[in-house]
């Protein structure tokens, strides 16, 4: 399947299919040089997939650390200096091969190298179906996740679904959080549909039917980011579960999607408190348990520490913390939430696991 952005200009294709990696070769000849920034784990399992591409004299491979460990100033400078040592021109391509962190990092390299070079996303995880589309790139700060970055559109997104076959279950769980988030944004019917399909760990682990839901997720994100590329309005909805989730992820060092799932439950609790919504918290917790999410760390959540991270969230303004909340299905808002409400919601979340 080939999708296409529909901005007024500078559009890019998104290939979502088995064997999509073959599309890379059609781009290589266009560039003076290309640098494949590949996650160390992906390189371990799939290095041979890139043998043909690396046979080109103008293509170089750079193996980078897996996951969030790569999104540091130190790794950023080291990688930039290596690329610059090859006397690159602006007609250079940075090709990101890996999960969401790899795409974030490589995209920031592309956005800042010579003030901008070509950028191709080759996501290899379920999680990256979300981050590879929409143009957000960046690295982390000691103050929080993704606080240093840019909006930078790729030249192409090449999503080869064959990469998903070897994902460990932890990465399947992490990626599914973003697929599930897109279903929540699409409403009650879409949420019921995905819950009925992926009803337990065994089905989720099999990835049976995942291709369809990944495609739906990408289409959902495309509709939103084309309407609001720079996150001034509806694009903020894509941060559902991320205000609290990023804080949990950054402090407790758990996978992104696991933390987002905790953040999704948390926002349901906040919505119930602020709007007298009737979200069934037990239902969502039991669903996560059925799928195999490890939730034991919830009892160790320390609100004061997490709150400091929440204060650094990019959605905030001078009035304080803003959260994306599902008031009711089909009625999503970005709402200021006071510290006391946030604290009570955290304490309530913990009571479900005592």
Swiss-Prot record:
**Could you tell me which pathway this protein works in?**
Metabolic intermediate biosynthesis; chorismate biosynthesis; chorismate from D-erythrose 4-phosphate and phosphoenolpyruvate: step 2/7
Main localisation, per the record? cytoplasm
- RNA-binding as a keyword? no
Spell out the reaction equation it catalyses.
7-phospho-2-dehydro-3-deoxy-D-arabino-heptonate = 3-dehydroquinate + phosphate
The cofactors it requires, by name, are:
Co(2+); Zn(2+); NAD(+)
Entry GO terms, CC: cytoplasm
Annotated keywords = Amino-acid biosynthesis, Aromatic amino acid biosynthesis, Cobalt, Cytoplasm, Lyase, Metal-binding, NAD, Nucleotide-binding, Zinc
Q: Which GO terms describe its biological process?
A: amino acid biosynthetic process; aromatic amino acid family biosynthetic process; chorismate biosynthetic process
Cofactor binding mode and count: Binds 1 divalent metal cation per subunit. Can use either Co(2+) or Zn(2+).
Q: Name one GO molecular function term.
A: 3-dehydroquinate synthase activity
List all disulphide bridges recorded for this chain: none
EC number annotated for this UniProt entry: 4.2.3.4
Entry binding sites for Zn(2+): 178, 242, 256
Q: What does this protein do?
A: Catalyzes the conversion of 3-deoxy-D-arabino-heptulosonate 7-phosphate (DAHP) to dehydroquinate (DHQ).
As for family, the record states:
Belongs to the sugar phosphate cyclases superfamily. Dehydroquinate synthase family.
Record protein name field = 3-dehydroquinate synthase
Instruction: State the organism named in the record.
Output: Staphylococcus aureus (strain Newman)
